[in-house]
Amino acid sequence: MHFTGRTWRPPYESASFIIQATSGCTYNKCNFCSLYKDEPFKMAPMEEFEADLAELKHYQPNARRIFLTGANPFAMSYERLKFLALTVRDYLIKCQTIAMFASIRDIRDKEVWQLKKLRAMGINGLSIGTESGDDETLALANKGYKIGRASC
């Protein structure tokens, strides 16, 4: 398996298999977070992603849930996410959930039809770091948006 930088996942993903899709954070300005401060955002090379899927298939061919690492892999383009989801499906035919971190900005940057398609392809486990529903707290945390942007 290929991992660079820090690898972190929420506790409720502890049973999920981890595959690196990105490293670093696209925003990297939150006042409370130092996890990726010295790590620029970059996408994992597709060759490494596929090699990791092949390794996972070898040891866990019936994997039903995977977690893509990085601060916000959902920042990748729709086309890249679609390709990753289809690649996961090629290697792990029983995989039902592709989970990852996403920011409000990442979700808002995508069209509704794209979100629906990605969900249908198995990207249906987004962990969204809203941190608070209070604009003053969001400003103190330097999240870069107000709560109105987090609602539909």
Where are the predicted features?
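Canonical Radical SAM [4Fe-4S] cluster-binding loop centered on the CxxxCxxC motif
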Residues: 4-48
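Short microdomains enriched in Cys/His and/or Lys/Arg
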Residues: 44-61
